[in-house]
Regions:
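Conserved ABC ATPase "signature" region
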Residues: 39-54
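Conserved ABC ATPase signature
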Residues: 58-62, 66
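Catalytic Walker B motif of ABC-type/P-loop ATPase nucleotide-binding domains
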Residues: 83-86
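Helix N-cap at the start of a conserved alpha-helix in ABC-type nucleotide-binding domains
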Residues: 94-95
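H-loop/switch region of ABC-family ATPase nucleotide-binding domains
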Residues: 118-119
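A short, surface-exposed alpha-helical micro-motif characterized by mixed small hydrophobic
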Residues: 124-126
Length: 168
């Protein structure tokens, strides 16, 4: 994994603060970083995440899933090289989780690299190609997702997978 600190990075958190203004106004804040963003760009980003009907709704009153989609719209506007997603579907219902995962897959089709954290093993299998398994703040294992799940190499990874798979 290579990353240049000069690259454009978008951050999508599962608890992102919103200003007490419309969803559209929250996206307009991206103009402070990139003045080339137009009203049409904002409208397109809202449409891409399915929030065009809620553009004038107060962002702080949107549901958790709608707020997450708004965060993804913000990332779309930034045209980043790298998107960091922290637990992108935490606390979302299954339908909204599926919608957000589809949006993440669309990002994956762009030139942006995606790096996401997740404790949801099924989501990791659906979305990731490569895994860094971290235990107590230390990378214990890294490599393609398939082999990690089929044949974990470290005791920590084996223990975690056994606990999680039994719990699921």
């Amino acid at each position: 994994i290579q990353f240049s600190f000069g690259s454009k990075t978008a951050l999508v958190l599962h608890h992102t603060p919103m200003i007490k203004a419309s969803a559209r106004a929250n996206l307009s804040l991206v103009r402070e970083v990139d003045a080339s963003i137009t009203d049409q760009d904002i409208d397109l980003a809202l449409k891409q995440v399915g929030l065009n009907e809620l553009a004038q709704s107060p962002a702080h009153k949107l549901s958790a899933g709608e707020r997450q989609k708004l965060c993804l719209a913000r990332a779309i506007l930034q045209k980043p090289n790298l998107v960091l997603l922290d637990e992108p579907t935490a606390n979302l219902d299954p339908n909204t989780t599926e919608q957000v995962e589809e949006m993440i897959r669309q990002f994956d089709q762009s030139d942006a690299d995606l790096l996401f954290s997740s404790h949801q093993l099924a989501q990791v299998q659906r979305l990731a190609e490569y895994i860094l398994f971290i235990d107590h703040g230390e990378i214990k294992e890294k490599g393609p997702v398939g082999p990690f799940f089929l044949n974990p190499q470290t005791a920590a990874a084996k223990r975690y997978l056994q606990q999680e798979l039994i719990a699921e």
